[in-house]
From Swiss-Prot:
The keyword Iron-sulfur does not apply. The keyword Glycoprotein does not apply. Belongs to the GatB/GatE family. GatB subfamily. Heterotrimer of A, B and C subunits. One of its GO terms (biological process) is glutaminyl-tRNAGln biosynthesis via transamidation. This is Aspartyl/glutamyl-tRNA(Asn/Gln) amidotransferase subunit B. Keywords: ATP-binding, Ligase, Nucleotide-binding, Protein biosynthesis. NCBIfam families: gatB (TIGR00133), PRK05477.1-2 (NF004012), PRK05477.1-4 (NF004014). GO terms for molecular function: asparaginyl-tRNA synthase (glutamine-hydrolyzing) activity; ATP binding; glutaminyl-tRNA synthase (glutamine-hydrolyzing) activity. It is an enzyme of class 6 (ligase). PANTHER family: GLUTAMYL-TRNA GLN AMIDOTRANSFERASE SUBUNIT B MITOCHONDRIAL AND PROKARYOTIC PET112-RELATED, GLUTAMYL-TRNA(GLN) AMIDOTRANSFERASE SUBUNIT B, MITOCHONDRIAL. The gene is gatB.
Length: 483
């Protein structure tokens, strides 16, 4: 039987506020366990929550950026359940009247098409603490530093039909929240966590199948793997005549396997009721307009500008505009390097490869946009060859020297572009390769002739000690060999 895949996402976005959603405790990452949890976070008797205005502002900014309705009246409820890292015995969240209503995000797919994914709603809530299982001799430690950290939980409609679409949406959302500055987007620190709801239905059927939820995926790669794994698992069960159990599952990316955590609860299992400690929050026009005035350039607008302003193709503009820090680095490079296409090639090539290899962010790169721009300028004005540029880049990256011209001078990398000198080298090399010259001139196939030119370039680069301008060498060769 053929199946349709149905996917919806729940994405927890940790807001980049300085303090927690209902207390004054710091949200800084990496502190010693239980050093950033005050009496409110610990649910001590007599404590009362005080809402964090910045969390509401960030939520409204998110709603505006995702074409969503803003809930003018926002209400908090208590979601009741027991877990060791939830000291109150309930989570303060939103259900009936969330701060962000229906919206949508358009995603770009590999085949060049665009798809609209609807957002059902996004609500504010507090994060739980963290259970620590290592170094406790068979016991579990509880760190409540994270308890009370503000989250937006984004809930999509089940509009996605493949892992590709789900990952594309997750990447687009990551791009939006980091561009807004409301989340640092560091998934290794739990700043964004993805829950994937998956079900299968017979191809063409309108009746949805039973869904499962795979929780706490913290990378795009794991999300893709988890979806593929769960789809295959459900197909195997259904095709063997079995029944899918509605449950929450945990995926292990290292082993490519999942296990059941618990039977999936319904909303009434959590006994939601309005939080008596928090009044409804009224969002007025002035607050919304203030949030709107704080919106930066968003990824789609930045992409369009990069295409128009710098003449980039759609692919390059998409890659360079998706990440706000990478976009800023690109623009700094172009400011100092002038040639936008050349700058784009180096950033997407050598620069990004080194970042990935060393697991660094753009902010941690040991080279600045100004330095890369200076190098791009020297490539564009034919001072540097591609091979020489790689040596300059290496010197910049390792901190050997931070001045491009000084590196070129010290390493003798200045490219020879004097046509008289280059012609003399070409004449000398051709004189020493009469058989190859004759073979080239007797060849009628243009493609083969073009390929045969490469046989002359090696000796020419050797004669010029690697400093001859390859483009000029090629032009001189074609002219002297007769086309």
């Amino acid at each position: 039987m053929q199946w349709d895949i149905v996917i919806g996402l729940e994405i927890h976005v940790q807001l980049a506020t300085q303090t927690k959603i209902f207390s004054g405790s710091s949200t800084a990452y990496g502190a010693e366990p239980n050093t950033q949890a005050n009496a409110v976070d610990l649910a001590m008797p007599g404590t009362l929550p005080v809402p964090n205005e910045q969390a509401f502002r960030y939520a409204v900014m998110f709603g505006l950026a995702t074409n969503a309705e803003i809930g003018r009246r926002s209400v908090f409820e208590r979601k009741n359940y027991f877990y060791p890292d939830l000291p109150k015995g309930y989570q303060t969240t939103q259900l009936a009247q969330p701060i962000v209503g229906p919206g949508y995000v358009d995603i770009d797919l590999a085949d060049g098409s665009t798809k609209r994914v609807r957002i059902h709603h996004a609500h504010l809530e507090e994060d739980a603490g963290k259970s620590l299982h290592e170094d406790y001799h068979g016991m579990t430690g509880i760190d409540l530093n994270r308890a009370g950290t503000p989250l937006i939980e984004v809930v999509t409609e089940p509009d996605m039909t493949s892992a590709e679409e789900a990952v594309a949406f997750a990447k687009k959302l990551h791009s939006i929240v980091t561009s807004l500055g409301i989340c640092d987007g560091d998934m290794s620190q739990g700043s964004m966590r993805f829950d994937v709801n998956i079900s299968l239905k017979p191809k063409g059927s309108d009746t949805l199948g039973t869904r499962t939820e795979t929780k706490n995926l913290n990378s795009f790669r794991f999300m893709e793997q988890a979806i593929a794994h769960e789809v295959e698992r459900q197909m195997d069960i259904l095709e063997d005549g079995g029944v899918i159990v509605q449950e929450t599952r945990l995926y292990n990316g290292d082993r490519d396997e999942s296990r059941s955590m618990r039977t999936k609860e319904e909303a009434n299992d959590y006994r939601y009721f309005p939080c008596p400690d928090l009044l409804p929050v009224e969002i007025d026009d002035a607050f919304i307009e203030d949030a709107r005035s704080r919106l930066p350039e968003l990824p789609d607008a930045r992409r369009a500008r990069f295409k128009e302003q710098y003449g980039l193709n759609d692919y390059d503009a998409g890659i360079l505009s998706a990440d706000a820090k990478l976009a800023a680095f690109f623009e700094e490079t172009v400011e100092h390097g002038k040639d936008a296409k050349l700058a784009a090639n180096w950033i997407q090539g050598e620069f990004s490869a080194r970042l990935n290899a060393e697991e660094k962010s753009v902010a941690e790169a040991p080279i600045t946009g100004a330095q890369l721009g200076a190098m791009v300028t020297r490539i564009a004005d034919n001072t540097l060859s591609s091979a020489g540029a790689k040596k300059v880049f290496e010197a910049l990256w390792t901190g050997e020297n931070n001045d491009v011209d000084a590196i070129i001078e010290a390493k003798g990398l200045k490219q020879v572009s004097d046509t008289g000198a280059l012609e003399s080298m070409v004449d000398e090399v051709l004189a020493g390769m009469p058989d190859q010259v004759a073979q080239y001139q007797n060849e009628e196939d243009p493609k083969k002739r073009k390929k045969m030119l490469g046989g002359f370039m090696g000796p020419l680069m050797k004669a010029s000690k690697g400093q001859g301008n390859p483009k000029l060498f090629n032009e001189i060769l074609v002219r002297k060999l007769g086309g």
